[in-house]
């Protein structure tokens, strides 16, 4: 990491259908081997399935799923003397969003529906209703932070 200059954030364009930057970030995270059109069709296909099953606005379901998965605290390792402590720290908003996106996609990929569209739509609907593995991951992270609250004075 450079001490002199911090890396400047790159501008990303909002997605063509909804005009939402978060959806673009989500698409970029789903994309494999630079195949943006495939990622786009997966995300929009999943949104169509969500709209068909829930009769709600897919963007609203997506944002509520992200909010339900996003962690507020996490633990970080801190070495003090000879011991390593798991210190609970608050999560910055950018990292919170990135973790939520990453956990949603990982949970969707682990599901056992046949297509990625079905997996993603299922995970989005589950997360919007506070169910599913992505929400469980958030709960585990919060439990870990709660269990290590005694070490919160080692915060930096």
Swiss-Prot record:
- Which keywords does UniProt give here? Ribonucleoprotein, Ribosomal protein, RNA-binding, rRNA-binding, tRNA-binding
Q: Which GO terms describe its biological process?
A: translation
Q: Which GO terms describe its molecular function?
A: rRNA binding; structural constituent of ribosome; tRNA binding
Q: Which residues form a coiled coil?
A: none
Q: Which Pfam families match?
A: Ribosomal_S7
Q: Does the keyword Metal-binding apply?
A: no
Alphabetical list of CDD domains matching this protein: uS7_Bacteria
Which cysteine residues pair off into disulfide bonds? none
Query: Can you cite an annotated GO cellular component?
Result: small ribosomal subunit
Described purpose of this protein according to its UniProt entry:
One of the primary rRNA binding proteins, it binds directly to 16S rRNA where it nucleates assembly of the head domain of the 30S subunit. Is located at the subunit interface close to the decoding center, probably blocks exit of the E-site tRNA.
Summarize subunit and interaction data from the UniProt record for this chain.
Part of the 30S ribosomal subunit. Contacts proteins S9 and S11.
User: PANTHER family annotated for this entry?
Assistant: RIBOSOMAL PROTEIN S7
Name-wise, this protein is: Small ribosomal subunit protein uS7
* Originating organism: Agrobacterium fabrum (strain C58 / ATCC 33970) (Agrobacterium tumefaciens (strain C58))
Q: What is the lineage of its organism?
A: Bacteria, Pseudomonadati, Pseudomonadota, Alphaproteobacteria, Hyphomicrobiales
The gene name reads rpsG
